[in-house]
Amino acid sequence: MTQILSCEWAIFLKSSGYIIYITKLIGGLMELNKIATVKTGLVLSRKESKDASERFEYRQLNLKAVCDNGTININDTIPFYASEQLTASYLTQVGDIVVKTSEPYTAVYITEEYANLVIPSHFVVVRVDITKALPQYIAWYLNKDRIKKAFSMSCAGMLKQIKPTMVGATEIKLPSLKRQKQVAELYEISNQEIKLLEKLIEQKKKYYKALISNVNRIK
């Protein structure tokens, strides 16, 4: 495990060693809808308030807020004013997986940080039976390039939008829960390092931009 964790960056970039290791952890196939409920999000117009004096305020998930690396930028979520208090089924819950219905079909595992966001209809919501599978593992699996390519090839029209039935019919390679946990932990470690590196890149960009501006002002 130490050797694997010492090269998390290479892991995330799909080095051959990582793919081989993950492949060894995988078991038999099972359709997602056998181990999870899969449905579309809320049609917002059905619950949107038309009365400014009588409404319930929420934060709403949107396509812009979902990053390609499977995270959510909370700052990009937007307000949603409902005509009534929404039931939990319309909101993100810890352990949920939300999948963009449009390319690149990014799947996001919902942590405490991403909970209680309104899920609109351009997302598919996957709620996994945790006695059969780990949601973190399923999120990793749905983000595989092969799965995304299959979604794209199965869609008709310019928008290439997927439906809950298509997501539910996805065949998942399902090893033991112990093996799933190993995969999920590796995936989480790689994502954490990626986020740190991306933050460092942004800081470096700002630093050099300021440095160049200062040099340019010197006479």
Put a short name on every predicted segment.
Residues 96-99:
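Generic structural signal for buried aliphatic residues
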Residues 117-122, 157-181:
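A short glycine-rich beta-alpha junction/loop motif
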Residues 33-49, 64-94:
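Sequence-specific dsDNA recognition surfaces
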Residues 12-56, 174-219:
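Non-catalytic DNA-recognition/assembly elements of restriction-modification systems
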Residues 135-148, 152-156:
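Glycine- and charge-enriched low-complexity intrinsically disordered segments
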Residues 101-140:
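A short beta-sheet element
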Residues 50-58, 78, 90-92, 110-122:
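Short, surface-exposed loop/turn microsegments at beta-strand edges and helix-strand junctions
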